[in-house]
């Protein structure tokens, strides 16, 4: 039980690192939450700080989710603080990733006012199911290209993830997932692309959560006041 608590605590703290706020302070001496949509996420960083800073913030937020879902769990599996919890391995990684997403949305380092959790959730999912996540990433990028709304792309991508898992698992009958050995650095890296049932259920929960955290964006979309992304507007 102690190991599980520590995994959740460490994952939450990793997710709580307010990357966009730090970037705003370092680059322009501002709090990005005082500008644009008022959100401390990658999308608002794109609007307020420019595409370079926005891209860096988004990538770091993705890394937070992946680190929580993979590295934190793997570390404590190798160095447990007592007995490891009797939980399905994929479910344990999902729980750790969720703690990071929760930390991103309710960051202890910035008055519990963080981002919407999309990038951190994407990082978590990539760490557990990389192939499915890459498919969803393609959907996300295509939606941004067509609509120019990051909020729309985020919502559609969130809905697409459990659908991709469902199709790959049952329609293509891939079972619990596939294993890959990728040649890298004069060796081979083992990657497991999970299609575990827990991932499907969790993907549905995350989809509802992403839609909920975008309720203000949905309101602005309906009223025609949502900001569109214009690439290259800032340096």
Curated annotation (Swiss-Prot):
Disulfide bonds: none annotated. It catalyses: an acyl phosphate + sn-glycerol 3-phosphate = a 1-acyl-sn-glycero-3-phosphate + phosphate. Coiled coil: none annotated. Pathway: Lipid metabolism; phospholipid metabolism. Pfam families: G3P_acyltransf. One of its GO terms (molecular function) is acyl-phosphate glycerol-3-phosphate acyltransferase activity. Catalyzes the transfer of an acyl group from acyl-phosphate (acyl-PO(4)) to glycerol-3-phosphate (G3P) to form lysophosphatidic acid (LPA). This enzyme utilizes acyl-phosphate as fatty acyl donor, but not acyl-CoA or acyl-ACP. This is Glycerol-3-phosphate acyltransferase. It comes from Prosthecochloris aestuarii (strain DSM 271 / SK 413).
């Amino acid at each position: 039980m102690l190991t599980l608590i520590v995994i959740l605590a460490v994952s939450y703290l990793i997710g709580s690192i307010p990357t966009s706020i730090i970037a705003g302070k370092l680059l322009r001496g501002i709090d990005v939450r005082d500008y644009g949509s008022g959100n401390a996420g990658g999308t608002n960083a794109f609007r307020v700080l420019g595409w370079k800073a926005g891209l860096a913030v988004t990538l770091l937020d993705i890394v937070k989710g992946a680190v929580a879902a993979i590295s934190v769990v793997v570390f404590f599996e190798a160095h447990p603080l007592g007995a490891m919890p009797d939980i399905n391995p994929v479910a344990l990684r999902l729980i750790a990733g969720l703690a990071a997403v929760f930390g991103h949305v309710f960051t202890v380092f910035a008055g519990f006012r963080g981002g919407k959790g999309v990038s951190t959730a994407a990082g978590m999912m990539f760490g557990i199911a990389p192939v499915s996540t890459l498919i969803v990433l393609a959907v996300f990028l295509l939606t941004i290209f067509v609509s120019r709304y990051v909020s729309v792309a985020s919502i559609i991508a969130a809905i697409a993830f459990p659908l991709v898992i469902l199709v790959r698992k049952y329609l293509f009958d891939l079972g619990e997932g596939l294993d890959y050995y990728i040649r890298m650095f004069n060796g081979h890296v083992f990657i497991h692309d999970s299609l575990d049932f827990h991932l499907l259920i969790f993907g549905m929960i995350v989809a509802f959560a992403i839609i909920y955290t975008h309720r203000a964006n949905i309101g602005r979309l309906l009223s025609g006041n949502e900001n569109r992304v214009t690439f290259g507007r800032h340096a």
